[in-house]
Amino acid sequence: FNLHGGRDSAYWYGQRDPTYAADYPLFPVALRPDNIPVVPHPEAVVFSEACYGAHIFNKQEMSSLALRFLATQAVGVVGSTALAYGSMAPPLVGADLLAKVFWERVKAGCPLGLALAQAKQSLAQEMMTGQGYLDPEDHETILSFVLYGDPTLVVQADSGDETLNLSYKANEEVQSPGPPFQRAETVKGGETTGPILCRRRVVETGLVSPELMARVRHRLASYLPSARQRDVIVSAQMLCHEAHCNEQCSLRQSMAKGNLPAQAKLVFTLRQRACTLEDDVHQQIVKATVDGEGNVVKLAISR
């Protein structure tokens, strides 16, 4: 399910097509717990990309779709306990990439738990290769997605048959996800440390050219047309290779002087809040990462 969700909502939501009339609900209800029939679903595996799709704290079967699926005997439910981010266009990021690799591993015969672990590792490796770091949205994806169900369960479909065959792998049969991804390391003062991504809000508007601000705002507006463009928040981010810098890294010092380091990237964040027909408030967030040449190198939007 590639739908929206909310922390306090029992439903998962769609999103209004830009070509629809403005009076059409911005987030129409797509799925309710009572839409899931009471008949058992002993062969179902569910992956939800919705924000809070697996948030079950203080919830019951009819206030959580994840619990509803489990109550109808779904063998596995994967979802996020927090915000979930995905792509608006290729390449895949966040929950979209995680879901893709998860289903590939399940189809290849991996147990559900191993499939999710390998999907997380693949996401981390791909982001490290492409970006050189894991940003906060990558971290949230890796940490927030969980599996409810038996992690040793293997789900396979016979060729030409819609029926799924269920089997289990004992602990000794389940292989590890594989070698950990590699990251750059530096040594300072005899201490080894990996690079840390520093992200700081840009308060001095002169650090961002009006032309770049206008161009990125226009890009963000195409995804969240109802949001107020003046509410765009800009942050600078770069890798810090200094251990225990006590917030005296080059990014902080440069920004204090009214400059941005050449290797710094800018992250533009826009939020939109809207009430659903059930009076739940849904917040949607879109983040665009822009390199030093003004190119949008990553675009992530919350589910």
Feature map (PLM): residue ranges:
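Catalytic-core segments of thiol-dependent peptidases
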Residues: 1-59
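Generic recognition of flexible, low-complexity loop/linker segments
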Residues: 3-9, 31-38, 64-68, 134, ...
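Active-site-proximal C-terminal subdomain of hydrolase catalytic domains
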Residues: 45-172
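Short, non-transmembrane alpha-helical segments in secretory-pathway proteins
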Residues: 205-257
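Preferential activation on post-signal-peptide N-terminal prodomains/segments
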Residues: 171-211, 295, 300
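Compositionally biased, non-globular sequence tracts
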Residues: 195-208, 218, 245, 258-269, ...
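A short, surface-exposed beta-strand/turn
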Residues: 280-300
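Exposed beta-strand-loop-beta-strand "reactive/processing" segments of non-cytosolic proteins
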Residues: 236-287
